Amino acid sequence: MESQQLSNYPHISHGSACASVTSKEVHTNQDPLDVSASKIQEYDKASTKANSQQTTTPASSAVPENPHHASPQPASVPPPQNGPYPQQCMMTQNQANPSGWSFYGHPSMIPYTPYQMSPMYFPPGPQSQFPQYPSSVGTPLSTPSPESGNTFTDSSSADSDMTSTKKYVRPPPMLTSPNDFPNWVKTYIKFLQNSNLGGIIPTVNGKPVRQITDDELTFLYNTFQIFAPSQFLPTWVKDILSVDYTDIMKILSKSIEKMQSDTQEANDIVTLANLQYNGSTPADAFETKVTNIIDRLNNNGIHINNKVACQLIMRGLSGEYKFLRYTRHRHLNMTVAELFLDIHAIYEEQQGSRNSKPNYRRNPSDEKNDSRSYTNTTKPKVIARNPQKTNNSKSKTARAHNVSTSNNSPSTDNDSISKSTTEPIQLNNKHDLHLGQKLTESTVNHTNHSDDELPGHLLLDSGASRTLIRSAHHIHSASSNPDINVVDAQKRNIPINAIGDLQFHFQDNTKTSIKVLHTPNIAYDLLSLNELAAVDITACFTKNVLERSDGTVLAPIVKYGDFYWVSKKYLLPSNISVPTINNVHTSESTRKYPYPFIHRMLAHANAQTIRYSLKNNTITYFNESDVDWSSAIDYQCPDCLIGKSTKHRHIKGSRLKYQNSYEPFQYLHTDIFGPVHNLPNSAPSYFISFTDETTKFRWVYPLHDRREDSILDVFTTILAFIKNQFQASVLVIQMDRGSEYTNRTLHKFLEKNGITPCYTTTADSRAHGVAERLNRTLLDDCRTQLQCSGLPNHLWFSAIEFSTIVRNSLASPKSKKSARQHAGLAGLDISTLLPFGQPVIVNDHNPNSKIHPRGIPGYALHPSRNSYGYIIYLPSLKKTVDTTNYVILQGKESRLDQFNYDALTFDEDLNRLTASYHSFIASNEIQESNDLNIESDHDFQSDIELHPEQPRNVLSKAVSPTDSTPPSTHTEDSKRVSKTNIRAPREVDPNISESNILPSKKRSSTPQISNIESTGSGGMHKLNVPLLAPMSQSNTHESSHASKSKDFRHSDSYSENETNHTNVPISSTGGTNNKTVPQISDQETEKRIIHRSPSIDASPPENNSSHNIVPIKTPTTVSEQNTEESIIADLPLPDLPPESPTEFPDPFKELPPINSHQTNSSLGGIGDSNAYTTINSKKRSLEDNETEIKVSRDTWNTKNMRSLEPPRSKKRIHLIAAVKAVKSIKPIRTTLRYDEAITYNKDIKEKEKYIEAYHKEVNQLLKMNTWDTDKYYDRKEIDPKRVINSMFIFNRKRDGTHKARFVARGDIQHPDTYDSGMQSNTVHHYALMTSLSLALDNNYYITQLDISSAYLYADIKEELYIRPPPHLGMNDKLIRLKKSLYGLKQSGANWYETIKSYLIKQCGMEEVRGWSCVFKNSQVTICLFVDDMILFSKDLNANKKIITTLKKQYDTKIINLGESDNEIQYDILGLEIKYQRGKYMKLGMENSLTEKIPKLNVPLNPKGRKLSAPGQPGLYIDQDELEIDEDEYKEKVHEMQKLIGLASYVGYKFRFDLLYYINTLAQHILFPSRQVLDMTYELIQFMWDTRDKQLIWHKNKPTEPDNKLVAISDASYGNQPYYKSQIGNIYLLNGKVIGGKSTKASLTCTSTTEAEIHAISESVPLLNNLSHLVQELNKKPITKGLLTDSKSTISIIISNNEEKFRNRFFGTKAMRLRDEVSGNHLHVCYIETKKNIADVMTKPLPIKTFKLLTNKWIH
């Protein structure tokens, strides 16, 4: 709505120019070229004479004949006031005012401005001649007053009094912004035209039709200044006025030029966007038209690229050309010329054979030329309000016809317009009814009329959001003072008087109603097309009718002026109002179901949908009349308001029309929703939905990821389901352009099945509206269901499933049927449905004990798809079950009472509704059923291994399952359940996202050992393992065992009187989830453990200690204890936050725990199986059912969860066993050959550097006398076995230097040419790390040396020949080798013997026994790696002395002398080391990784979100046989070798935190599935993200007298294939991590304790060797320690009893470990699981735990 408000001039009356609730100003849509002087009638210079006799004063200047002039009125009659929206007023050229022209009948009192004070301002005087209309024009229009009942002025009387009636012109609006100036100029030009000044307006060429007079210039100047304030003028206008402030004509001329240019460009863009071609015109003409438009736009600076142009052209193709949309849309680089070649080909084919049909595509029905315009299309305003004006030869003044003339015209019945109407009803004037339509409502007392309004009609407005009328005559059920805010285009409020209904009665007897607002402050009665669309009525502007979506014509549309109108004759007066639904009387004698109850029962669907469903019997068991609908209209569901909050309505009508021609289940829409974050790993993160185009039947499937194979499985499932269940074949599937749909795998699958994929265009989500809206609707329902029920978020897909079942059964208001009915299925029986989250009690037919409660509290989710049962969530068991054995818990409406639904309770309604079903349940309760143990059809949510919050008030004390009193003996008060709601846990535990959550895996375990083991990684409880106990007392447990057995029989119950509930850390799967359970007292724990542990070893001794250190020998002094405690003191263990006590809910105390033997797994199946069972029962618990075990294991195969190893018994089939003729894998080559580096190298600079390196190498070879230069041998004379091929290799080093090396092909060397017993030794990495650690602690100088061409210093004993280098040009000759050339098998061993001999004899060094290439004397330690030497010494001069000796024999380079006291940087054997003596040492590989990783061609994400961990728990590798061709297999194996090779190099150097992932993935190098590659990429991505991490060492405390060498051990029991265990060890010297190892156990362990023993036994040999090395290099005493988090293992080590070892393998391993610990004086100590940093070696950990365990030693 546009309001003309002259706020800058308060003395001038305000007026309203037009009325609309759209933001479009009605006068701004005229073609800009229509305002030029060439289309305006020439100005008639004849003017009427001035009325010189009339005297005018400011008090009597109004013209009495015009009712809108403010005539003098009595004091008692106030002037009409309309606030900011006054009645319609006009502007007049009044000559009777000598002081100026009159505006709105008031005397001119325009204040003088600086412009008016200029000499160019000519105030009009009495003789001034203002423009007047010629007398032949006729009577000008005038608007009636509110008091007048006549609409038009009598023509005859007006003619007789021409001198007293003036022409009143609508003033232009005020300019309020520089951006609005172009639109404002249009209205200003129209104002000049209506003022008979059209002749002075500049034409297109900038010249007016006639010259402007001085008076006209004054008039033009004044009006421009008033309505265009200078502060709102654009800059270019101000620039013109700054030169000549009166040059208004130049401003108008430039404005018209801009309008013309913008119009041409806009027309071209509109034409291009609305192209249509079906072959009816020659293809050449169509091509010429399109190319001309594109060229014109490009020339004007609007670039249209080929992609956009092709999309626009293809969108307009129809008929035989339409298929080009689908055959060409995949060509990303398609050009317009290529597209027109296809169009020409089809056109020529049509001309040659019109009757033949193309055979290269499916021939769907041709798209109908439906020009129907929907109200919510992308251009509603252009279609509905402002269509393109038709050319009209009549002048503007033709509107002023006489009323009597129009009334004498013949008339016809306009209502006879039928569907075939194609010509618009064009009214040039409201009196010119050339179709004879009668104005039946001209006498209605409207408040306002505009001069271009068609009386008796409603203006159709596509942009208006609400319908507004000025008369209350047609408003039904009106209510006053509505709280509604309506604003116009300028965001100004429009006061609303009332709201009601506007009722229509159309010509086909259709009755409907819409909401209407009443306000007198508008110029038109507006009918909103948006509100008509809501009642299934659309406006077709090609037929000019209102019609329903099925094409039924309801009423004609009349075009008058620029707008379209519909007659008010179809409105029903308010005196025949029909009673509304609110007036329906409800009988008190009949109890009806309350609507809020039904609303919640049916998944919170809206009232209209529910009523349609009941009316059409898609919901059975009760009728529409059984529901109380009195509150349906005004009812607001709080859960719906929260869960279904949305932005705006979805745009309708976006699908292609031809889709309607498909049969049921032939055209599917699909889309993927997700991910949902912060959920357990067992819960799905995505779901994929499918919708049938014809029936609107919906399917949803859960997904854990969006990988290709996951999507392919779902597609295979649904296609098979449709084929078998509905005997239909899917032809087309519409989907978006996500990578999960556009991948090659799915494309081949669809192509193989003959299915056409239909993709949406880029960024065009509207074209995918069916699937997008379904996902949004289901998500709204999901949020609402979870909000209402209070269930945890990990059950979100159950809410989706419930909503899908219900919505498939609800009728569509449009089709009057449900999706199930369309699909030919029976309706949904609501008596079998429960509200989502309805509290129930599930029967446990097989409890642990006969005295245990038989009922388990649960929450109903949705009907089962695989049985007649119901899927119910059991929080206490953390699982869902499919069962019919449940009872509805009365009085529990979940969260329904939280919002105060008028204190409604639905117990009685629910009982009546499910009465028949209760009888069915009761009749089956006596049967022994196993359906409680049948998993849901969604196994991803079964057996959720987590500890979420216990349900708040899961059972009130009145219904406590521990109460032994029968229900019949309770009092009446006790029978009624407490009003406190039973509600599911609101959320999962906060740490659940970091936990190892998986379906439980049932494995057979040995009962004798299942409970003594405290943990696989620390244990479930803190056990009373005796600490610091003498070995001599280890047998005393036998005497106490019998006495304690009896006590334990009574300790199974968890009553508060017997148990102290305190916080005890629970080892989650993998020992990573910090939760608490009620702790049992020390004495009670000991009783239970000893009683339940007829174990492999003796039970612990009785006496306890507060220490956590268990020595192998009996400690007799305090000093020994302090020594053992000091072992842990300086280790880089994580600091754990203090645990705050947590009070557990009453239900946990009241309900006895239902125990499980479940185990969890994580990445690689790596988790703990040590679920601690507290009740010894021979009966299997609810979770131990065999059926459940089978389903749970099958779940691993169907979940598509990414992981490393599935712990299942199915034998793994690697591809290497199935693929034949895989001879070898090409080695990884990082160097260049001679031809690559020199011959064909196009990089001139690099080529020159390689040539230089080549000559340098040749010179070095000659200098070292590498071969015999005295004689050349003929090839035929030498034994071929002794001829070694040679070659030059080139590479570029990290420091930028280019190097060449002449090498022998040792890979094809004959075995007879070398001694296989010789060894080529290099320094062990542990020796280097040990030396570096000791150097830091002892302030050593570190010197780095390099011996050039080291191998060439070693003589060769064998007779070998090689071909000469290429530069010699002797290809047929051979030369004999004299030195150990690089590449020969024996060269390394020869060099080692040579340098070893020199160091011992000439340098006074000796080699450390057991550690090759480590040499020492009293002052210096040397680590040798081929030609690199690292020297360590406390005296730098000692190092220099060694260097001097080496230079006497070898070409020795000093890389880094290490003499600075500041930080020194080294590059030692790939490690980038930062060393400051006496302070710290940092080891990393940032520069190396920055250079190498990008060369691996791994899809890195350098700017995206960085990974926080190298993997995540709960992921499994699918071991199904891989189908792949041989070439692709070799390529992928080669890629895996490169990736894992680099990762191994980095991991074993210093990134010990990655060793578990590297070790697991390395086992799959020969199984390069897509999943394995993805996980390898993820590992490389993590290495890239953390390439700046360093291994941090700090100098040991100087007060420490001894060196401390510690091995920390851990094991994950049975988490590898074939139930092998993963073991890991970390080695620390003086608190610095120097090494780590992660590997799979060589034998199958049968318990957690056995796995821990195996891990410790693997660490002992290396620990002893390192101990010897440390003692050799540093003469300090050494303390050795073994740390483990398994107290049962410690108990075995300190025990002397071996009678209960169950087998000899375990026994021998344990006995050997006892001997090693005892003989090597090892201190075995206990470490808490949460602090066990070796945990990272055995399993994937959550992000939080991974960081906690590693942030102290690597960061």
Curated annotation (Swiss-Prot):
Residues 1338-1476 form the Reverse transcriptase Ty1/copia-type domain. It is found in: Cytoplasm; Nucleus. GO terms for molecular function: aspartic-type endopeptidase activity; ATP binding; DNA binding; DNA-directed DNA polymerase activity; RNA binding; RNA-directed DNA polymerase activity; RNA-DNA hybrid ribonuclease activity; zinc ion binding. Residues 1610-1752 form the RNase H Ty1/copia-type domain. Its main location: cytoplasm. Initially, virus-like particles (VLPs) are composed of the structural unprocessed proteins Gag and Gag-Pol, and also contain the host initiator methionine tRNA (tRNA(i)-Met) which serves as a primer for minus-strand DNA synthesis, and a dimer of genomic Ty RNA. Processing of the polyproteins occurs within the particle and proceeds by an ordered pathway, called maturation. First, the protease (PR) is released by autocatalytic cleavage of the Gag-Pol polyprotein yielding capsid protein p45 and a Pol-p154 precursor protein. Mg(2+) 2 binds at D1346, D1427, D1428. Residues 153-165, 402-418, 960-969 have a biased composition (Low complexity). Residues 299-401 are annotated as: RNA-binding. The record marks H401, N402, N582, N583, A1217, A1218 as: Cleavage. Mg(2+) 3 binds at D1610, E1652, D1685. Residues 583-640 are annotated as: Integrase-type zinc finger-like. The C-terminal RNA-binding region of CA is sufficient for all its nucleocapsid-like chaperone activities. Integrase core domain contains the D-x(n)-D-x(35)-E motif, named for the phylogenetically conserved glutamic acid and aspartic acid residues and the invariant 35 amino acid spacing between the second and third acidic residues. Each acidic residue of the D,D(35)E motif is independently essential for the 3'-processing and strand transfer activities of purified integrase protein. Retrotransposons are mobile genetic entities that are able to replicate via an RNA intermediate and a reverse transcription step. In contrast to retroviruses, retrotransposons are non-infectious, lack an envelope and remain intracellular. Ty1 retrotransposons belong to the copia elements (pseudoviridae). This is Transposon Ty1-DR5 Gag-Pol polyprotein. It comes from Saccharomyces cerevisiae (strain ATCC 204508 / S288c) (Baker's yeast). The lineage of its organism: Eukaryota, Fungi, Dikarya, Ascomycota, Saccharomycotina. The gene is TY1B-DR5.
